[in-house]
Regions:
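Short beta-strand-to-turn element immediately C-terminal to the catalytic PLP-Schiff-base lysine
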Residues: 27-28
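A short beta-turn/loop motif at secondary-structure boundaries
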Residues: 16, 41, 89-91
Length: 152
C-alpha cells in the first residue's frame, strides 16, 4: 500500500500554537553539568543547556541527538525524558514548550562548541554560572530526579 503524503494545509488551526523545543541536561558523575555559552540572542553570552527547536517531521529523540551533536559534538549518549516546561514567558521570542531530556555519563568526555554555541564546558551542577531562559528551574528538577534515582 502506497503511503499518503501529508498535506500541511489539509488541517488549519484557528489558534496560534507554541513552538516545540528540546533541552538536554547531561551530568557527569563528578557532579558537573554540561552547559553551552549562547552565541546568539536571546541571552547571548549566558550559559544554557544544549538544545533547540524541533524540526518539522522530526521526532523528539532525533531532535535531541541532533542538537547535542550540533552544539557539543557528542553522539550516542543515553538520555531519557525528565520533564516539560511551558511557561508562556520562558522565551522572549514567543511561547515555547521544551521537552527536557537528561542523562549521566561516568567517563571523561571531551566536548567542543559548534553551531550556535560559543563555548561548551562542564560546570558545577550545584553552583552553575548564571543560566539563560528558565534553565535554573530545569536544573533544579533534574538534580531532584538524579537524587531520587540514586535512592532506588
Amino acid at each position: 500500500m502506497a503511503s499518503k503524503s501529508r498535506n500541511p494545509k489539509a488541517y488549519c488551526y484557528e489558534h496560534p500554537r507554541p513552538a516545540l523545543t528540546v533541552d538536554i541536561v547531561l551530568f557527569h558523575r563528578s557532579g558537573s553539568v554540561l552547559l553551552i555559552k549562547r552565541a546568539n540572542e536571546p541571552f547571548k553570552g549566558l550559559w544554557a543547556f544544549p538544545g533547540g527547536f524541533v524540526d518539522q517531521d522530526e521526532s523528539l529523540e532525533a531532535a535531541v541527538a541532533r542538537e547535542l551533536e550540533e552544539e557539543t559534538g557528542l553522539k550516542g549518549i543515553r538520555l531519557e525524558q525528565i520533564g516539560a516546561f511551558g511557561d508562556p514567558g520562558r522565551d522572549p521570542r514567543g511561547h515555547t514548550v521544551s521537552i527536557v531530556f537528561g542523562g549521566v555519563v561516568d567517563r571523561s568526555i571531551q566536548v567542543r562548541a559548534a553551531d550556535d554555541a560559543a563555548d561548551a564546558a562542564w560546570h558545577s551542577a550545584t553552583r552553575p554560572p548564571k543560566l539563560a531562559f528558565d534553565h535554573k528551574k530545569i536544573l533544579k528538577l533534574a538534580l531532584k530526579r538524579l537524587a531520587d534515582s540514586a535512592k532506588q
